[in-house]
Amino acid sequence: MKHLLTCLFFCSILSISHLTQAQTLNNFSLKDIGQSVIITMDGNGKMVNLGVDMENYGSPFFDPEFLPANIVLATGQRYENVLIKINLLSNEVIYKTPEGKELAVLPAIKQVELNKNGEILFFEYGFPVYEKQNHKTIYQVLAKGKVSLLKYFFIQVTEAKPYSSATMLRTIEQFPRLFLYDQSLSLKKAPKSNEDLLSLYKADATKLQSILQKNNLKIKKEEDFIKCIAKLNEN
């Protein structure tokens, strides 16, 4: 399968390199892709140095394994069957080179189609600001249409030094949070009950009520929430 060609910009922590010749993803080199940032912020705005040697519990990655994916850049250019991991802490897509290097792809990305055990999972950037989240925050798209159901992963990092131990312990926890994005072009924290959903979308309340009742859905269950929004978007 042929890869699309493009001129891309990539940067490392200490320097920025300009790719002057179109290349496929299969022959990138270290000068073309910068390393993933080591110092970053957790969900509380705390600086986290992932380069420090510590005993770690938990992971900032959506999946710790490299999985095949298609990447669509903000320019519309598409790359297929790339091995990646998604760093939910730094909001980066980490690309694995043929030489085994793990590097961050830093050009603006619009969408990632991640293949996990045959199931295609969609992730997108570019949503409005909500508290500490911005257009560079990555969301998993659970349902998309006139109303989109999004999942944001709040990452909390805690560090502690146990009594009489010389080793620092770092715990990385993921807290999924659901959001709705609609034609008002704003992010809304997803309601947790059927009643609150009907109150939020009063114009579609009759339609939503019918969907909820006919399918016996309770949106406090994520799978039911996904079905509800998907059916709303069908009409």
Q: Predicted regions: what is each one?
A:
Residues 168-170, 181-187, 192-208:
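Extended, compositionally simple fibrous regions characteristic of intermediate-filament-like scaffolds
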Residues 198-235:
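Long, compositionally biased interface segments
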Residues 1-26, 228:
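Bacterial Sec-dependent N-terminal signal peptides
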Residues 28-33, 105-108, 114-115, 193:
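General structural signal for secondary-structure boundaries
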Residues 62-188:
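Aromatic-patch recognition
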Residues 18-58:
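Sec-dependent signal peptide cleavage junction
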